[in-house]
Amino acid sequence: MKFKDLRDFVQQLEQRGELKRIQMPISPVLEMTEICDRTLRAKGPALLFENPVGFDIPVLGNLFGTPERVAMGMGAEAVTELREIGKLLAFLKEPEPPKGLKDAWSKLPIFRKVIAMAPKVVKDAPCQEIVIEGDDVDLGMLPVQTCWPGDVAPLITWGLTVTKGPNKERQNLGIYRQQVIGRNKIIMRWLSHRGGALDFRDWCVKHPGEPYPVAVALGADPATILGAVTPVPDSLSEYAFAGLLRGSRTELIKCRGSNLQVPASAEIVLEGVIHPGEMANEGPYGDHTGYYNEVDSFPVLTVERITHRIKPIYHSTYTGRPPDEPAILGVALNEVFVPILQKQFPEIVDFYLPPEGCSYRMAVVTIKKQYPGHAKRVMLGVWSFLRQFMYTKFVIVTDDDINARDWNDVIWAITTRMDPKRDTVMIDNTPIDYLDFASPVSGLGSKMGLDATNKWPGETTREWGRAIVKDEATTRRVDEIWTQLGID
């Protein structure tokens, strides 16, 4: 099922019983977080708070609170279908040379489809139905959540940030949290390796001292939102990928105050500039780790213009100790990652990011082991192949007889197939999420790889244990007489 905009998605979710309207007045300060957290843990519906206390704009929460709704947002009917999206991305990331003329013709429709999904620029758009500029700009009109008791200020969480580097042809989309610090000021918390930060750095080098244009789209259609958090190949724009998911070209409109292009159907758009050198301390905020992060300095965006649809919807979320929405997104996107990794490492059978590991900090990989040291090659590959895993602290590699998604299996493999000294890989001074306060230096720490595979000659000189396997005939016999035994 495809959705033309956020409102279409909301309508379809409501028809399926996947969205609940809350008419009782609810405060964006703490109350919405508590309600959304309880609902998410119960695998409940998306929530539309129609009467947020003190505001006229409704708040949409828990939108991607189940893997099934994430799959729906990506145009899939089931989570299992996300593997096919991963296969497409794997192909586009590293297309294989055709094996012959017939193979070349068979692949041609894929490239035609990608080319056909180039975004379409329109002259008029719903996101600019209402325009607020200059002294009339007031971020206080938005029902921005204060999620946790220790949060320093309201926090914009689902803003789709649009930037463009001076040396790049296409725009970058990224989702960075934004602290509101004034009627027209927000802090842009982008980490140094993220696309927006890199674009801004390049701008400062090429245009020193000049203001840098930025736009933030709130309430885009689900395909565009999810396209921004998916490992899209550098050769494919997030807008084009969203078109592939949606089955129709992404409509964009030029911002009123810059050449940046934003989703035409977005509910709300913030337009502004970052003045080089204008920084502010961000935080503390409760984060996906389950802790409050330390205070750090980031650029300030001066909002010069707010445009929005008539009767807009404000899309919001919270982050906290898993499960939260980022963890649920991780569970769904896990299925997209698997084919991409398998294209590079065909020996990988499964790849799993346990949600309790804060979405990406731990990975479990099962492989068809082929030679001594194979597990170490795979763990090094996980850390280096995709940017999404540069912050993964722990990689556990097991044989394919282990279920990567069953901790009973994984712990059994670790405790029976590992020698802590021989089978542990430690790497110092690697990139680490600055929110990881356990690292000795902000943004820099170590990684651990655990080789929980059966050891081959060359890895051990001892006779290796053989796993106990039940006798099939006995199992069938007991199956036949089980009900007669009266044990259950």
Swiss-Prot record:
Keyword set, alphabetical order: Cell membrane, Decarboxylase, Flavoprotein, FMN, Lyase, Manganese, Membrane, Metal-binding, Ubiquinone biosynthesis
Which Enzyme Commission numbers does its entry carry? Answer: 4.1.1.98
- Note whether Transmembrane occurs among the keywords: no
Q: State any GO BP term from the record.
A: ubiquinone biosynthetic process
Give the annotated active site: D287 (proton donor)
One GO cellular component term:
cytosol
Molecular function (GO) terms listed?
3-octaprenyl-4-hydroxybenzoate carboxy-lyase activity; metal ion binding
Q: Which residues bind prenylated FMN?
A: I175, Y176, R177, R189, W190, L191, R194, G195
Q: Pfam families, alphabetically?
A: UbiD, UbiD_C, UbiD_N
Q: Does the keyword Calcium apply?
A: no
Q: Which NCBIfam families match?
A: PRK10922.1, UbiD family decarboxylase
The record's function comment reads: Catalyzes the decarboxylation of 3-octaprenyl-4-hydroxy benzoate to 2-octaprenylphenol, an intermediate step in ubiquinone biosynthesis.
Family membership, please give it.
Answer: Belongs to the UbiD family.
This chain belongs to which protein, by name?
3-octaprenyl-4-hydroxybenzoate carboxy-lyase
Which species? Answer: Pseudomonas syringae pv. tomato (strain ATCC BAA-871 / DC3000)
